[in-house]
Amino acid sequence: MPINKVVKNAEEACNGISDGMTLMVGGFGLCGIPENCITELVRKGVKNLTCISNNAGVDDFGLGLLLQTKQVKKMISSYVGENDEFERQMLSGELEVELIPQGTLATRCMAAGYGMPAIYTPA
């Protein structure tokens, strides 16, 4: 049975998100990010999230909002250079971080969508 992917608002879109989930968050830089859904996740207080995204936002915008409230336990990303809170949490060991090249990130996301168990890239 097909899933209805049309929702009325961010609250409805985030209803199925709970503690410990892995979320792939869209956008490039600060453009095209799901701002309303991120705000809703902050409001809901879900925690221990693993976030997969091109970037980590900035201190007061994008995924930076979830980092400020310490709702992210692991970040898988290719660029994180503009977020001071991210840097603080990473250096203190509060945040698990997996930095990967942008092309590898895109390929891993594509492979996951295809159900491929592995991809091979040069070392």
Name the predicted role of every residue range.
Residues M1-A123:
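Conserved alpha/beta enzyme-core scaffold
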